[in-house]
Swiss-Prot record:
The keyword ATP-binding does not apply. Belongs to the UDP-glycosyltransferase family. This is UDP-glycosyltransferase 91B1. It comes from the Eukaryota. UDP-alpha-D-glucose binds at residues 286, 342-344, 359-367, 381-384. Pfam families: UDPGT. Its EC number is 2.4.1.-. One of its GO terms (molecular function) is UDP-glucosyltransferase activity. InterPro entries: UDP-glycosyltransf_plant (IPR050481), UDP_glucos_trans (IPR002213), UDP_glycos_trans_CS (IPR035595). Keywords: Glycosyltransferase, Transferase. SUPFAM superfamilies: UDP-Glycosyltransferase/glycogen phosphorylase. The gene is UGT91B1.
């Protein structure tokens, strides 16, 4: 008779951004469902933002005190959504101040494992000293993290040979096979201009942090699966000299949305009035910064496409202030502009939604495709263009055409792309492929559970797992 598996205590510690915290919470629930105890580490305000989880699960929330004395950091700012893009480096400075409280937690609770995020360069040496096993969990897909970073030694030593925007429009030298997963020139210029350094007290840039986080890990966990990008997952292991475990896509379900039944009832009532697969859902993320001209161009495109749409605009876009004059009045019979939180998974799972205009954050793209919704892609920065290239190659969505040098686009091209993906006969390939890949990969619960189970089995028996 087989011996019962030991019950573990696993601590998880995501970066201070909802796009990281939510998949870490998904992972926590999966681990807890196997009978293990999970300590979810963050700050008080971030913990309060998370959706409720079943009291049957042994998931304990551990609040660490984030410094409120860092210059230029707004009062009560505890997540990337609380600060402008130019001030995220100050949040990293405050985050680095959590090391002492984190050490005290490890000393007192003695978890078997710490699962930490890509910016947590100081976590692995603390954990190793205290005898805690270490896994880095990257919430990006493998191709994106390889293109962005490269081998750990290159990132730590600052030896990335790519010094200009033109260097980013071709594959990096550490990718040994042909690929079209690269930046376009206007995207590469944005990467070069991204505010990641130059703040007093923040001595390490993001690539150096990631490199050190890799080096200190025993295993790399990636939010992906072999059915999507096998060659990239294998390359990640080769580049970092570590075992890589794809954990699956951790797709959310409508039940995972935070409780706000009143909001959902209002939205559902509007969606229920429309035909199946006819509504265009537009959401460009909670933290994406886009220009006035881009908002105006998208708005005019939605007006021209003549399809019903539901557009969620969050604070980073300054919402309706940027919309064209008279836009709301002209589209009021078929369009909704929503400026508050929305239950995105519930919207995407509704039968009336036939297309998703997305910035191509990995989590958002996975959500849309887990419900079989084809994508209209408008990537903005960071990993988003790389995700768009990966998914475009699968014909499960179409990018809005943009000038490769300056990123300009026309409202007509927005309308044409939306109609092509959602209603026109020529775009049937995208609708069919999105539905097919939902069944095969993105919404395949059995497949995704197998990946998660494989990782948990590794935690339970790491020697055999490697």
């Amino acid at each position: 008779m087989a011996e019962p598996k030991p019950k573990l205590h696993v601590a998880v510690f995501p970066w201070l951004a909802l796009g990281h915290m939510i998949p870490y919470l998904q992972l926590s629930k999966l681990i807890a469902r196997k009978g293990h105890t999970v300590s979810f580490i963050s700050t008080a305000r971030n913990i309060s933002r998370l959706p409720n989880i079943s009291s049957d699960l042994s998931v304990n929330f551990v609040s660490l005190p984030l410094s409120q004395t860092v210059d230029h950091l707004p009062e009560n700012a505890e997540a990337t959504t609380d600060v402008p893009e130019t001030h995220i480096a100050y949040l990293k400075k405050a985050f680095d101040g959590l090391s002492e409280a984190f050490t005290e937690f490890l000393e007192a609770s003695k978890p078997n494992w710490i699962v930490y995020d890509i910016l947590h360069h100081w976590v692995p040496p603390i954990a190793e000293k205290l005898g805690v096993r270490r896994a880095i969990f990257c919430t990006f897909n493998a191709a994106s993290i390889i293109i962005i970073g490269g081998p750990a030694s290159v990132m730590i030593q600052g030896h990335d040979p790519r010094k200009t925007a033109e260097d980013l429009i071709v594959p990096p030298p550490w990718v040994p096979f042909e690929t079209n997963i690269v930046y376009r020139l206007f995207e590469a210029k944005r990467i070069m201009e991204y505010p990641t350094a130059g703040v007093t007290g923040v001595e390490l840039n993001d690539n150096c942090r990631l490199g050190l986080a890799y080096v200190g890990s025993e295993v790399i966990v990636i939010r992906s699966c072999m059915e999507l990008e096998p060659e990239w997952i294998q390359l990640l292991s080769k580049l970092q000299g570590k075992p890589v475990i794809p954990i699956g896509l951790l797709p959310a379900t409508p039940m995972d949305d935070a409780d706000d039944e009143g909001t959902w009832l209002d939205i559902r009532e509007w969606l229920d009035r429309h035909q199946a697969k006819s509504v265009v859902y537009v959401a460009l993320g909670t933290e994406v910064t886009i220009s006035n001209e881009e908002i105006q161009g998208l708005a005019h495109g939605l007006e021209l496409c003549r399809l019903p749409f539901f557009w969620t605009l969050r604070k980073r876009t300054r919402a309706s202030m940027l919309l064209p004059d008279g836009f709301k009045e002209r589209v009021k019979e078929r369009g909704v502009i929503w400026t508050e939180w929305v239950p995105q998974t519930k919207i995407l799972s509704h039968g009336s939604v036939g297309g998703f205009v997305t910035h191509c954050g990995w989590g958002s793209a996975v959500e849309g495709l887990s419900f079989g919704v084809p994508l209209i892609m408008f990537p903005c920065n960071l990993d988003q263009p790389l995700v768009a290239r990966l998914l475009s190659g699968m014909n499960i969505g179409l990018e809005i055409p943009r000038n490769e040098r300056d990123g300009l686009f026309t409202s007509a091209s927005v309308a044409e792309t939306i109609r092509h993906v959602v209603v026109e006969e020529e775009g049937k390939i995208y609708r069919n492929n999105a539905a097919s890949q939902q069944k095969k990969i993105f919404g395949n619960k059995r497949l995704q559970d197998q990946y998660a189970d494989g990782f948990i089995e590794f935690l339970e028996n790491p020697i055999a797992g490697v």
